[in-house]
Every structure is written in C-alpha cells, then in structure tokens.
C-alpha cells in the first residue's frame, strides 16, 4: 500500500465484483496519493508527539512540558515585569498607601479582578457577602486584620442552636430579642422572654450582642444583617446554623499585591490622609 505495486484485481467495468442491494457495486478507485501521504505524515507526527510530550500515565515526555508549568512560567514572567511598579509601595504603610492615587489605581484593578465577583463592583456586597464600605467588620477592620483576611481567608461557622435554645416558641422569642437589640420592630413581650434564652448565643456574640471579631461573630446590635433580616430569617439561622467562607488569596496574589489591596480595602471605609507631594 506504500508503493502501490499490489493492486486489487479489477474487472473490465472497474469494479471489485462486490454487489449489494442488487445494484450497489464497489468501484476499484485507489485512494488519492495526497491522502495516503497525509496519513503517513499523521502517524509519524503522532509518534514524535508521543515521545516529546506527556501522553501515557506518568510519562512526562522528553521535553518535560506541562500546561501547569507553562502557566507558572507565564505568571513568573508577569510578576517579574510588574515588580518595579510594586517596589515603590513596599516602604509605605496601608494607611499611607490609601492616600496615594497611583497605589489606589493599582488597588482598584486588583479589587475588580479578584474581589468584585463576590463583594460587587461598588464593594457594597450582597446577601452573605459583606459590605466593605461601611464600618461593620466580622473579623476586624484595621489594616493588619484585613491583610490576614486577604492572605489566609476566613471560615465563619454559626452552629445550629435550636435545640440549645429550647422549643420553637423559645427560638421565636430569641429572634425578637435579637431584633430588639438593633432597635428593629419587635414584640416587646417576646423579646423579654427571649433575653433569658439568649445566653446560648452570648458565648460568641456577647451578652450585649455586639459580637466578637476574634471569632468572626457578627454584631447583632447594629442595623447590618448579612444573611437576611426579620423574624423568619433569624429563626432559620438559629435552627439551621450558617456557614460562610472567604477564600485566602496568598496562592493567587503576591505579598506586595496583597499589601496594596489591603490599603485599598481599608480605604473604602476610612478617610485616608492625602499623600505628601
């Protein structure tokens, strides 16, 4: 089939003699030469490719190439190119960077590329995603706490406490007490009854309901309701608990990038002093 010296014996009418469905015959037309050559080239290419690149099991190929390695090389090249930009920010504190227009321009781009998907382009968040422009912080709002959050991430867990609180009526009473802490409309009688049962919640939120940043326990005495407001929303959280997570960015952003992003996030809820010329 390579040299073309072996051919199927053809009849006078250029058929192989095979007939189907009474009149369907197989013609003795050879494959085009270009098709045969292309097939041979394809086979050779596949063999060479299989030797050079990863193909079977743990075989890594002669070149040692991988898509992960190529991606990392491109990331390293990019980090090398932008290193001079961040070098001028390294000696400044987050508070100082927050007043530096060029640094905040970089910080805004970092935020839009890595944070806006959850917290929104205006940083005002959404249900279950905190508003970064107010003064309400689950884990602390100083630059050090923000940098820790960005670097390591946070895991917030509110255990289901319905059984610990008591009966469904007890849970409802606690919900009204929680609403009363922030001055929200509530049943004063139920709120008074729920106060005694609130001790099951006070271990994290405190007896005054103002929360504990060390635990990520929200302040229940303000008007910020991250996971929904109202009797039914609070009852649902008390009975079922709540889990929320903020992914760490250390594996995605460099330390210098996190430093600038910290300043940007801190500046969203603070008024930084303008940078000195």
Predicted region positions:
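Axial heme c-ligation environment in periplasmic c-type cytochrome domains
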Residues: 126, 130-133, 151-171, 178-189, ...
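His/Cys-centered metal/cofactor-coordination and adjacent catalytic loops
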Residues: 66-103, 116, 120-137, 154, ...
């Amino acid at each position: 089939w390579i040299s073309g010296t072996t051919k199927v014996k053809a009849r006078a009418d250029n058929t192989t003699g095979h007939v189907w469905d009474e009149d369907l015959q197989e013609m003795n037309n050879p494959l085009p030469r270009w098709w045969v050559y292309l097939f041979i080239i394809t086979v050779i290419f596949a063999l060479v490719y299989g030797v050079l690149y990863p193909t079977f099991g743990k075989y890594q190929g002669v070149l040692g190439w991988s898509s992960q390695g190529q991606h990392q090389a491109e990331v390293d090249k990019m980090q090398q190119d932008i290193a001079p930009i961040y070098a001028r920010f390294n000696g400044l504190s987050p508070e100082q960077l927050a007043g530096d227009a060029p640094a905040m321009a970089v910080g805004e781009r970092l935020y839009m590329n890595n944070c806006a998907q959850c917290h929104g382009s205006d940083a005002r968040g959404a249900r279950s995603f905190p508003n970064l422009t107010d003064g309400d912080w689950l884990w602390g709002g100083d630059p050090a706490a923000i940098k820790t959050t960005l670097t390591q991430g946070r895991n917030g867990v509110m255990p289901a406490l319905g059984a610990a609180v008591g009966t469904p009526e007890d849970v409802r009473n606690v919900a009204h007490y929680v609403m009363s802490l922030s001055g929200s409309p509530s049943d004063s009688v139920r709120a008074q009854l729920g106060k005694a049962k609130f001790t099951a919640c006070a271990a994290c939120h405190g007896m005054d309901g103002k929360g504990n940043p060390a635990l990520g326990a929200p302040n229940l005495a303000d008007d910020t309701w991250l996971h929904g407001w109202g009797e039914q929303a609070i009852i649902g959280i008390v009975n079922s608990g709540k889990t929320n997570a903020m992914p760490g960015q250390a594996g995605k952003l460099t330390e210098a990038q996190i430093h600038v992003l910290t300043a940007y996030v801190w500046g969203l809820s603070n008024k930084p002093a303008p940078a000195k010329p």
